Amino acid sequence: MKRILLLSLFLTFIPFTSHATTGLVVGCFGIKVDKTVSKGLSLPCLDGKAKVIYQGIRGPVVINVFGSWCAPCNQEIPHFLDLQALHKVSIVGIDVEETNMQAGRNFVIKKGITWPILYDTNNATRGIFGPGVPVTWFINAQGKVVYKQIGVIASTLKLKSEVNKYLKVKL
């Protein structure tokens, strides 16, 4: 009986998070876009089924530009997983400089990512986001970039604070 009680107490204090789940390569149908925007940078969805014109994306949305090979990008994934778990703001990833699309898919599955990912096949996003990663942009409902985070987002608290401040989304 004593063991059961101790085990129950122990299990109560173990944090259960989505970080251990398997990711899913999802389609881009959930990305809010202004369909009247017909010109701009067209990026394929990592699932290979659709393309999205970057300039047509509308928010509130957090755009995270990353590469699976990038150590700081890997460090910030848990913070995006925490944000996604709140279901309050959209996240869209842009995978850059991968050897191929399958490498990006493998990364998504391994890291537990479940938000739409666009795939930059030829470094076309460098002209928009710059050459380094990670880069995170916060885009409002009108499609305006209201904040740019260059470099790693170091904590979930910082990410949530930026969403609150720049996208006016209460978390």
Identify the residue ranges that each predicted region occupies.
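Conserved redox-active cysteine motifs that mediate thiol-disulfide chemistry
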Residues: 65-82
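Thiol/disulfide oxidoreductase modules built on the thioredoxin-like
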Residues: 109-113, 120-167
